[in-house]
């Protein structure tokens, strides 16, 4: 990523930024799993600090292009529908405004975050498109018990409103003529962090998310998430991070394979990640990462295990 400050005033600056991210696999057998994201944003940042109080406001308009191959999870080949290749189905252009604000004090901090986006997916006449509107609004409050421990409460509402995807009936069928899908989410989270000395801290997260299918409730769910994180910096050059999470879904109405004979849909997942970095120079670091993800479901189409190992270099300016 790169950011250029266009104009700077005592407490506010205007900027333009570019970010690129993705995954690239050298093995030709895995090239269909390559993903890329390019994002350009323009906005302003306000920051003012006085003694123990600080105020930050960030506003921007962002445009992003995401590209990936819509491939078969069993054999890795490009997906087809009715004999027609639909490998570009998951490519999309995303754009919209965003705003975040934070007020921090010696003990109490609070803030908000808001987004409004349009996601425009690649046209595929033979299958429904994933085009949708996305809205997000969140609030948080944080309290520092001591200089080394804090507790944060977060409330989020977000919504995805599709333009070309019929909603599901209670029998699991997605019939033409049904209203388009609209999913509304309400999440409440709790985070606790504790610092141990200057070089180490750990934290725990708990969150409950309720999704409402606004048609007849077929795809409603309740998701309980539990997470932990640990960070250790024994010196100026070395960093070590460990984090993991467990998610349990409760679908009261949905069926596996969207078929009544498949029985009630169940899903749970576990993720774990280890990241280490060694700073070789002021700007250059060597990094290594291991990532594990396992999803178990009565709908085996979404059940999988994945383990990734990465090694690379990172440049920070």
Predicted region positions:
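Gram-negative and organellar
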Residues: 1-317
């Amino acid at each position: 990523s790169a950011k250029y400050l266009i104009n700077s005033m005592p407490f506010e600056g205007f900027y333009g930024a570019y970010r690129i991210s993705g995954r690239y696999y050298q093995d030709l057998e895995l090239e269909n799993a390559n993903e890329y994201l390019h994002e350009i944003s323009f906005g302003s940042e306000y920051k003012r600090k006085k003694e123990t109080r600080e105020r930050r406001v960030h506003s921007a308009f962002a445009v992003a292009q995401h590209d990936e191959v819509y491939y078969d999870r069993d054999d890795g080949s490009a997906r087809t529908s009715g004999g027609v290749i639909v490998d570009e189905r998951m490519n999309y252009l995303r754009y919209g405004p965003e705003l975040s604000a934070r007020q921090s004090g010696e003990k109490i901090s609070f803030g908000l975050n808001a987004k409004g986006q349009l996601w425009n997916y690649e046209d595929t006449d033979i299958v429904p498109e994933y085009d949708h509107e996305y809205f997000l609004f969140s609030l948080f409050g944080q309290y520092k018990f001591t200089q080394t421990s804090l507790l944060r409460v977060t409330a989020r509402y977000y919504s995805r409103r599709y333009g070309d995807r019929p909603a599901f009936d209670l029998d699991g069928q997605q019939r033409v003529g049904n209203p388009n899908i609209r999913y509304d989410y309400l999440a409440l989270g709790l985070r606790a962090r504790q610092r141990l000395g200057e070089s180490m801290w750990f934290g725990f997260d708990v969150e409950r998310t309720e999704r409402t299918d606004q048609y007849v409730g077929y795809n409603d769910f309740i998701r309980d998430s539990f997470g932990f994180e640990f960070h250790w910096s024994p010196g100026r050059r070395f960093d070590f991070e460990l984090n993991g999470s467990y998610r349990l879904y409760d679908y009261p109405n949905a069926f596996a394979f969207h078929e009544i004979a498949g029985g009630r849909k169940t899903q749970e997942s576990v993720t774990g990640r280890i990241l280490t970095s060694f700073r070789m120079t002021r700007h250059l670091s060597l990094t290594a990462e291991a990532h594990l993800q396992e999803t178990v479901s009565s709908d085996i189409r979404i059940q999988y295990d994945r383990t990734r190992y990465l090694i690379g270099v990172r440049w920070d300016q």
